């Protein structure tokens, strides 16, 4: 049964869905990392695919840019298609000099200037956090591949073009490991519907130094992040979580 934004049928999605912002990155992941991948949805060109990774059924689908967009897709995947785990695999900006372009960061929590979780939580602060066991599995996956990851809080911004750049200094002071636009919303939706979620991001640009990757690199590379996400699913299965 299709939803207003996803034209897949029940059973088309695996219980775990990797979600990049860019639907073309979803296509890239399906074509380069999954076996026997089949496209299951394409409404508004927000492509979704299901295949297998080392024999394990896994899906991948884009979620668009910003909390409103990703919240729609994550809600429908969990509520209507029975998805149990969401792994965001996206890009982020760095504000700390100790974090470099192309580093991989894991968001154990996500701060935000959005009010969406306050709306959900009756105007109280909600601690938007990842599932602990998913964080643990991702760390183990990175260690097994010899990839150094930074674990900490993300900041999910409402505005890409911020009118107050001084906020980046505050984020740096508070130890923010990456600035992006979705994790806090995804964690909020997962909590609302009793699912689990994790955001793994690759640093695409450094807000303070100006170093950045190209749009083509963001679409077609960042393979370490994808491998960590996929391996973490297998580790979670083996450990019973």
UniProtKB/Swiss-Prot annotation:
Where is a purine D-ribonucleoside bound in this sequence?
5, 180-182, 204-205
**Origin superkingdom:** Bacteria
Query: Any keyword Electron transport?
Result: no
Keywords (alphabetical) are: Glycosyltransferase, Transferase
* GO cellular component, as recorded: cytosol
Function recorded in the entry: Catalyzes the reversible phosphorolytic breakdown of the N-glycosidic bond in the beta-(deoxy)ribonucleoside molecules, with the formation of the corresponding free purine bases and pentose-1-phosphate.
| Record-given protein name | Purine nucleoside phosphorylase DeoD-type 1
Species whose genome carries this gene: Vibrio cholerae serotype O1 (strain ATCC 39315 / El Tor Inaba N16961)
